[in-house]
């Protein structure tokens, strides 16, 4: 894996009245720090079957690369990663199958590990996709599973993405979220610091580009809040360590300095599976019997 590349964001002198902004004060004086933003951004799509993950990934990429169709059964079978250049950055988009299903099976466990490998060393943003007007008990279970699988801290890197934005019929998404009587949705929006945006996945041209710009503003906000860092946990750290070890061993072999007896992929994937299993058990214990 390549090291993260960063670009420096020049600091401007803000207007005097902004010096009293309580949000900036609580964030630790971001204006006083030299901020970093990575050139390569990893965005991983999460959500229940039928939420529109793959279609949203296609909208972000500006082309149809992930299979997407209306179906009650999962269309995406395995995690996939595709990328595009946008505004001087490389956006890596990882589409996932229903890895947050409450029915954990060996197949789901393997799919989780595959998603971790594809998004290593960690995602800069998790895009939690849900259909407008359809935030149900199943979505609440997805939110809980997201925390069980990746850790409670993952919500600090999560953006709520509503699909079928066109159903607002010209109305405001802000008004919809603010006025919702769905308490679980309202709680989640507040927990995510109101990081939400909407996608009409049939949009083209400027409308599609405007949606992406809005999403990337939310991603940029996450980068500021986390000083440019991606999300990581034990499973991601283990994966990255193995990537680096493999690269080092391959380099030594090519230079005639090492042994060709490199541990196989199956061996370290078994280790990843065990670490992930233990992490999920710990996260589940931490969450206890909370509502989400």
From Swiss-Prot:
Disulfide bonds: none annotated. InterPro entries: G_AIG1, GIMA/IAN/Toc, P-loop_NTPase. Signal peptide: none annotated. One of its GO terms (molecular function) is GTP binding. It comes from the Eukaryota. Pfam families: AIG1 (PF04548). GO terms for cellular component: cytosol. Keywords: Cytoplasm, GTP-binding, Nucleotide-binding. Residues 38-240 form the AIG1-type G domain. It is found in: Cytoplasm, Cytosol. Residues 1-39, 250-275 are annotated as: Disordered. Coiled coil: none annotated. Its main location: cytoplasm. GTP binds at residues 47-55, 68, 164-166, 201. Highly expressed in spleen, lymph nodes, lung and placenta. Expressed at moderate level in thymus, kidney, heart and digestive tract. Weakly expressed in other lymphoid tissues. Detected in T-cells. Belongs to the TRAFAC class TrmE-Era-EngA-EngB-Septin-like GTPase superfamily. AIG1/Toc34/Toc159-like paraseptin GTPase family. IAN subfamily. This is GTPase IMAP family member 6. It comes from Homo sapiens (Human).
